[in-house]
Amino acid sequence: MVDSTLIKDSTDTSVAEPVIKPHLILALDYGVKKMGMALGNSLTETARAFDILAMNNGQPDWDNLLGIIKVWGVAKVVVGLPLNMDGSSSMLSKRAHKFARRLAHRIMEQHLPVIVSLCDERLTSVAAREIAWENGWIKHERAPIDDISACILMSTYFADPHSSIAIDAIKAD
């Protein structure tokens, strides 16, 4: 005997709820000398420090970065935008924006289904250093905290994902 509650009525025109598929997000704390990385899970809205990449005057090892995106199956990259406290652009924020455009362009060239966006990262480094000190993760003032900053950037993104700005790869330099 078949349970009639399991049979869909052909006159039922309701649309099923869309299934939200969890995906990985890569947060990048952009810098001229180094770039912090964190991986976030869209379902649990949690992030983990991942790595710190060496930068050559603001340029990463593109093959390495794109390889990380491919291997981990990243669906979105969030690049930190270091604005001034009054919200105006800084020299570094202009470079971060240019980096994000270049990244989007390279991702497009690789035919990867990855979205690149920018997210305000004001005070992430200050918060990261404070958290690292409190937890004993660093022992001296100059210890690298870029990956922790990327985690905080990811938390900022999860708190308000609609505040990020999507990057158009067509405008890449």
From Swiss-Prot:
Keyword hit for Cytoplasm: yes
Highest taxon, organism lineage: Bacteria
PANTHER family to which the protein is assigned, alphabetical: POLYNUCLEOTIDYL TRANSFERASE, RIBONUCLEASE H-LIKE SUPERFAMILY PROTEIN
NCBIfam families: RNAse_H_YqgF
Organism listed in the record: Psychrobacter cryohalolentis (strain ATCC BAA-1226 / DSM 17306 / VKM B-2378 / K5)
Function: Could be a nuclease involved in processing of the 5'-end of pre-16S rRNA.
Catalytic class of the enzyme: hydrolase
Any one annotated GO CC term: cytosol
Taxonomy of the source species: Bacteria, Pseudomonadati, Pseudomonadota, Gammaproteobacteria, Moraxellales
EC numbers on record: 3.1.-.-
Protein name stated in the entry: Putative pre-16S rRNA nuclease
